Amino acid sequence: PTLALQSLSLIIDDADRRAALLRASEIAFHQATPWWSTMAGPLGDAVVARALARSEDPAAFAQRVRAIEGLFKQWRLPRFGFMPPMAAAWLAFHSDPEVTAALPRMKAILAAWKKDHPWLTTGDDLLAAAMHAVRGAHSDRVGRLVEDRYQALHQSGLWRGQSLQRAAQLAALH
C-alpha cells in the first residue's frame, strides 16, 4: 500500500505542477496576444497547451504567431477573421525556412481551390491551406486531391458547400 500511495502522490503532485505551469503559460500567452485576436480566447489556450508540450516559451510563441500573421500582408493572404491567426499558429510550430516556403504555397493552394469553388473559397480556408503548404506538395496536386475528395464526398450523398469543402481539405491530408 505504501508504494501505491507514493505513486498516487507523484501523479497528483505532477498533475498539480503541470496545471500550474499551464495556467501560468496561458496568462503569459494572453498578455502577449492582442485582445481582439482569435488567440485571446479559449482557442489560444489549446495553442498554449501544444506549445508547452513542445517546450516553447508562451510569450515568445505569441510573438512568433503575430510576426507570421504580419507576413500574410506581404503575400496578400487573408488577414481578417477567425482562421488567419489559427493558420499563423499552425505555421509557428514549424521552422523559419518551412514558414518561408509555406507562404507562397498557401497563396497558390488558395488560388487552386478558388478555381474549382470561387464562391466557397475564402479566408476560412487559410488554416487548411497552411496545413497542406507545410507538407510541400505542389498547389496543383493539392487542388486536384481536394477536388477529388470533394466530388467523392458529394457522390456519397453529402451536400455541396463550405462544410463539404472543409471536409475534403482535411480528408486530403491523409
Report each predicted region and the residues it spans.
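Periodically patterned hydrophobic/aromatic "hotspot" residues that form packing/interaction faces
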Residues: 5-9, 48-52, 87-90, 128-133, ...
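Hydrophobic core segments within long, regular secondary-structure runs in both alpha-
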Residues: 22-30, 62-70, 100-114, 143-151
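Short helix-capping/linker segments at secondary-structure and domain boundaries
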Residues: 12-18, 54-62, 92-100, 135-143, ...
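N-terminal domain-start signal
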Residues: 1-86, 121, 158
